[in-house]
Curated annotation (Swiss-Prot):
It comes from the Bacteria. Keywords: ATP-binding, Cell inner membrane, Cell membrane, Membrane, Nucleotide-binding, Sulfate transport, Translocase, Transport. The gene is cysA. It is found in: Cell inner membrane. NCBIfam families: 3a0106s01. SUPFAM superfamilies: MOP-like (SSF50331), P-loop containing nucleoside triphosphate hydrolases (SSF52540). The keyword Cell inner membrane applies. One of its GO terms (cellular component) is ATP-binding cassette (ABC) transporter complex. Gene3D superfamilies: P-loop containing nucleotide triphosphate hydrolases. It comes from Brucella melitensis biotype 1 (strain ATCC 23456 / CCUG 17765 / NCTC 10094 / 16M). This is Sulfate/thiosulfate import ATP-binding protein CysA.
Length: 359
């Protein structure tokens, strides 16, 4: 089922939670709505579900305008962060609940509801637990039951609101792999909300990065990580280091130093340089590079994280270097980013012409 959000605006007591949001979700896609608190991601999910109605704009399920239709009319499955299972019902009864409460003409028989519940328990790898109650399950098992319940009604769209947020890190990691496998088996159009970038990048076919009620970027995990189109996306997805620089005649300057990066297609003026701390090339010395004084160094797994003062001690950045590097305090380190992006100073939406990787 294709879902299309067209020019949607949502206000709560005149507070704009979404600003003119448009998005097309292809049939069978697994989409992540990713952003910090207050970005509008949960509001967008609730609008797709029918739990909220848009102030302006329309929401289509296929060619059908679903903007004013209820959750039941849209036939969506919804999975909440805290499971929302009925404590007094067995696992099988929880899964079959959505089918049991259907109107008489569309309600399956008791035997069919049980068959469907057992079938889904097998799919979510919980066979044999149908007679247990939610209190007798682990958090990960409860979330699997919640997903099975959402799928029992054979929804046109499956929606998940931070489904793993209440679980510990190891369980979340296991359930991410499991959810991707379930999606590939069933082919549901699936939208999930998360603030966890690792979760979004690992699970989704495409990631919708949101900030302050707007969509900043939509792309594959590789696209939003490798080609972020705004300072916000660069800073939010993965780790980043940034320096205020100046562009003059196609060259990039930090304070009074030409740092050896070309910006031929960018107009002269102030800019912001972004790069990943691990994507740097260490240099023995250079006439055009970034050089700094070590003010802190710490071991982090197989690497070493180093904090440097650069630009005449006016700026501080972090880079990641091999663990065996001594990086003594007050020593000098020279480096150049391998991959980097320039944004015009003060530009929060669109990138300046982007430089290629250095060599």
């Amino acid at each position: 089922m294709e879902v299309r959000v067209a020019g949607v605006r949502k206000e709560f007591a005149r507070f704009p939670a979404l600003h003119n949001v448009s998005l097309t979700i292809q049939s069978g896609e697994l989409i992540a709505l990713l952003g910090p608190s207050g970005s509008g991601k949960t509001t967008l999910l609730r609008l797709i579900a029918g739990l909220e109605t848009p102030t302006e704009g329309m929401i289509f399920f296929g060619d059908e305008d679903a903007s004013q239709k209820s959750v039941q009319e849209r036939n969506v499955g919804f999975v909440f962060q805290h499971y929302a299972l009925f404590r007094h019902m067995t696992v099988a009864d929880n899964i079959g609940f959505g089918l049991k409460v259907r109107p008489g003409g569309t309600r399956p028989s008791t035997a069919e509801i049980r068959r469907r519940a057992l079938e889904l328990l097998d799919l979510v790898q919980l066979s044999g637990l149908e007679k247990r109650y939610p209190a007798q399950l682990s958090g990960g098992q409860r979330q699997r039951v919640a997903l099975a319940r959402a799928m029992a009604i054979e929804p046109r769209v499956l929606l998940l609101d931070e489904p793993f947020g209440a679980l510990d890190a190891q369980v979340r990691k296991e359930l991410r792999r499991w959810l991707r496998e379930i999606h590939d088996k069933t082919g549901h159009t699936t939208v999930f909300v998360t603030h966890d970038q690792d979760e979004a990048l690992e699970l989704a076919d495409r990631v919708v990065v949101m900030s302050q009620g707007r969509i900043e970027q939509v792309g594959t995990p590789d696209e939003v990580y490798d080609k972020p189109n705004s300072p916000f996306v660069y800073g939010f997805i993965g780790e980043s280091s940034t320096l205020p620089v100046r562009v003059e005649n196609g060259e990039v300057w930090l304070a009074d130093r030409n740092i050896g990066l070309g910006a031929e297609n960018m107009p002269d003026g102030d800019a912001q340089l972004y790069f990943r701390p691990h994507d740097v090339e260490l240099l023995d010395g250079c006439g055009g590079c970034i050089a700094g004084t070590v003010i802190a160094s710490r071991r982090s797994g197989g690497k070493r994280r180093v904090e440097l003062e650069v630009g005449g001690a006016r700026e501080r950045i972090e880079i990641e270097i091999p663990a065996e590097h001594p990086a003594a305090e007050k020593s000098r380190i020279a480096f150049r980013p391998r991959y980097w992006t320039l944004f015009r100073a003060g530009d929060s939406e669109l990138p300046a012409p982007k430089a290629a990787a250095t060599t």
